[in-house]
Amino acid sequence: MKNLILAIESSCDDSSIAIIDKNTLECKFHKKISQELDHSIYGGVVPELAARLHSEALPKILKQCKEHFKNLCAIAVTNEPGLSVSLLSGISMAKTLASALNLPLIPINHLKGHIYSLFLEEKISLDMGILLVSGGHTMVLYLKDDANLELLASTNDDSFGESFDKVAKMMNLGYPGGVIIENLAKNAKLKNISFNIPLKHSKELAYSFSGLKNAVRLEILKHENLSDEIKAEIAYAFENTACDHIMDKLEKIFNLYKFKNFGVVGGASANLHLRSRLQNLCQKYNANLKLAPLKFCSDNALMIARAAVDAYKKKEFVSIEEDILSPKNKNFSRI
């Protein structure tokens, strides 16, 4: 019975393929190969290197799931937003598969995929607020009961996750910075460094992490010897202030929208300090908090496959001749 959808994710530095049953939502296959170690020596993702590693990793993963090919009914792939050369790796493979197996091709927006990480094994819920925090994006969304997405707030410059990477780089801590900063912050003892919360007195529903990042840079310059103890104090102060900033604007949004349900997605949503703060906020406003599983917060093909199930039902297919690659976020107005 042809009821399986194969999905490919390659928007940045994770090569991933997943296969899902469109009827039961059962995951039949999921594999991800991360490039973090390859990029860590450069302090960030190098697009050309990412593309080459995708071209090596994706075929290796594909060989492991060939037994399911006979039951495939569609091929899905992340087509936006992301690094052009990385996206192209996945799209090229998806088009080749769709052509060879004579199957429909489904393009999936990467950010929609993150939203679907909340609903990997269940029907999607509408009428809820969503915080999306990742290395490339920081936004608060309202998923309306008609499936339309309304953008309530976004960042004016750096994203939440990106700011962690940059602060880690300032202190020569390595890449990716999120987990490194989070773990280092736990070692802070004095907690005598503090930073101002960005846009604290602004009524604008927006985020900005560039000023906080600069404040960290200036704090680092104060210390001739940046000891492990001082690094921990800076990491703690930065993480706490970055989360304060997220919560400050969210509180204003909660007062306006009275959410009954609120979801949190994206790679940076794995930060446990942020999760704890969000739980407290939702308890305060009697909202049900829904968190993506830690395993599926970062980029993965299973969330793309899950999004593709609903897209398949709506017959959102494209021709393999169509140019579907877009580094920017184009198709993100509704689920």
From Swiss-Prot:
Q: Which cofactor does it need?
A: Fe(2+)
Q: Per UniProt, what is one GO molecular function of this protein? A: iron ion binding
Key word Transcription regulation present in the record? no
Q: What's the Enzyme Commission number for this chain? A: 2.3.1.234
The biological processes this protein is annotated with in GO are: tRNA threonylcarbamoyladenosine modification
Quote the function comment for this protein.
Required for the formation of a threonylcarbamoyl group on adenosine at position 37 (t(6)A37) in tRNAs that read codons beginning with adenine. Is involved in the transfer of the threonylcarbamoyl moiety of threonylcarbamoyl-AMP (TC-AMP) to the N6 group of A37, together with TsaE and TsaB. TsaD likely plays a direct catalytic role in this reaction.
Task: Give the protein name, as stated in the record.
Answer: tRNA N6-adenosine threonylcarbamoyltransferase
Q: Keywords, A to Z?
A: Acyltransferase, Cytoplasm, Iron, Metal-binding, Transferase, tRNA processing
Q: Which residues bind substrate?
A: L132, V133, S134, G135, G136, D165, G178, N271
Tell me the classification of the organism that encodes this protein: Bacteria, Pseudomonadati, Campylobacterota, Epsilonproteobacteria, Campylobacterales
Gene encoding it?
tsaD
